[in-house]
UniProtKB/Swiss-Prot annotation:
Record field: catalytic activity: succinate + ATP + CoA = succinyl-CoA + ADP + phosphate; GTP + succinate + CoA = succinyl-CoA + GDP + phosphate
A GO-annotated cellular component: succinate-CoA ligase complex
Organism: Neisseria meningitidis serogroup C / serotype 2a (strain ATCC 700532 / DSM 15464 / FAM18)
Organism ancestry: Bacteria, Pseudomonadati, Pseudomonadota, Betaproteobacteria, Neisseriales
Pfam families referenced in this protein's UniProt entry, alphabetically: ATP-grasp_2, Ligase_CoA
Name of the protein in question: Succinate--CoA ligase [ADP-forming] subunit beta
Pathways per UniProt: Carbohydrate metabolism; tricarboxylic acid cycle; succinate from succinyl-CoA (ligase route): step 1/1
Domain ATP-grasp: 9-245
Keywords per UniProt: ATP-binding, Ligase, Magnesium, Metal-binding, Nucleotide-binding, Tricarboxylic acid cycle
GN (gene name): sucC
BP GO annotations: succinyl-CoA metabolic process; tricarboxylic acid cycle
Length: 388
């Protein structure tokens, strides 16, 4: 689950991090009032969406009057912002954050942290190249990224934070200020089950003080049951409607931009299925894992979910029967096709537990369902059907 910038800053401020001041506005009048309250020579109006690249997409604007703040807010709120991190439809802008004047600054730094699966530890990353995408820095000048791995048994040590401060070129009081900032970030990361933390840029102001100008936080969704206050911050308007519906039925669904819907049990098999569809010249429309313990109701809902995507021109169902029985899947497929009145080609590949019985149910259903003998055959048939 992702947080908005204003939510991330509020959370980080609670752990002692110096964040750029800002006031949330839901309309032009509130934005104008926020500008007056901040009282600076200018302010920055930022669209609140769950996506990066807002500046280049026109979602971050500098304003020099209350009238301009109102005008910019009204031009953003109620629209969809399209960035390089969104799909073609973009993300809805329901509010803007009117931020205080902090510029000019001495320099802009970067500080982030992730859960490193290879080391099974939290890894902090810092760079002197703040204000630009860290992916670009990693690709062009990787030597400018400094990493610190934290032992979970002892936590982040002050000496580790000081070492990062030295590498960033900080001096005197800035070092202690940075140690406090990084320690607070680590505490927030652990206590709130972050999956991602990023401050970009971390500004060094003209007076030498540090300030978090932006804040990006991703929460491990599996931990939300023990984070009720964090769970309340969830903004469902920023999530794909079908992905949101899928979560209600414990389905793992990710929307893509192809035209071949996929229903598979098991994440690995789902990825392999998408790969072979691409190999055969097709384009998968989604990743959908119904899980190892799929029930008939979940399979029916999964089918409905796939067909709600109007770009889907065919469906490939690939089931390996282990825990789940292929005959139960076949019954669910038949029920779903009858209920929804499917008018696109459907190719089904069943292997494993009760696969023969499942194939019999499909063949005797009287419906236009194409059986496949193996994954290769299934991919070829669905690609051919869609291109026919």
């Amino acid at each position: 689950m992702n947080l908005h910038e204003y939510q991330a800053k509020e959370l980080l401020a609670g752990y002692g991090l110096p964040v750029q001041g800002g006031i949330l506005a839901h309309n032009g009048e509130e934005a104008a009032a926020a500008y007056d309250k901040l009282g600076g020579k200018f302010a920055v109006v930022k669209a609140q969406v769950h996506a990066g690249g807002r500046g280049k997409a026109g979602g971050v604007k500098v304003v020099k009057s209350r009238e301009e703040a109102k005008e910019v807010a009204e031009s953003l709120i109620g629209t969809n912002l399209v960035t390089y991190q969104t799909d073609a439809n973009g993300q809805p802008v329901n509010s803007v954050l009117v931020c205080e004047d902090m510029y000019p600054v001495q320099t802009e730094l970067y500080l982030g942290a992730v859960v490193d699966r290879s080391t099974r530890r939290i890894t902090f990353m810092a760079s002197t190249e703040g204000g630009v995408e860290i992916e670009k820095v990693a690709a062009e000048t990787p030597e400018k990224i400094f990493k610190v791995t934290v032992d979970p048994l002892v936590g982040l040590q002050p000496c580790q934070a000081r070492e990062v401060a030295f590498q960033l070129g900080l001096k005197d009081k800035q070092i202690n200020e940075f140690v406090k900032l990084m320690t607070g970030a680590y505490k927030a990361f652990v206590e709130n089950d972050f999956a991602l933390f990023e401050v970009n840029p971390l500004a060094v102001r003209e007076n030498g003080a540090l300030a978090c100008v932006d804040g990006k936080i991703g929460i491990d969704s599996n931990a939300l049951y023990r984070l009720p206050k964090i769970a309340e911050l969830r903004d469902k308007s920023q999530e794909n409607e079908r992905e949101l519906k899928a979560s209600e039925f414990d389905l793992n669904y990710v929307a893509l931009e192809g035209n071949i819907g996929c229903m598979v049990n098991g994440a690995g098999l789902a990825m392999a299925t998408m790969d072979i569809i691409k190999l055969k010249g097709g384009q998968p429309a989604n990743f959908l894992d119904v899980g190892g313990g799929a029930t008939k109701d979940r399979v029916v809902e999964a089918f409905k979910l796939i067909l709600e995507d109007k770009s889907v021109q065919g469906v490939l169902i690939n089931i390996f029967g282990g825990i789940v029985r292929c005959d139960m899947i076949a019954e669910a497929i038949v029920a779903a096709v009858k209920e929804i009145n499917v008018d696109v080609p459907v190719v089904v590949r069943l292997e494993g537990n009760n696969a023969e019985l499942g194939a019999k149910i499909l063949n005797e259903s009287g419906l236009k369902l194409t059986s496949a003998d193996g994954l290769n055959d299934a991919a070829e048939k669905i690609v051919a059907a869609v291109n026919a």
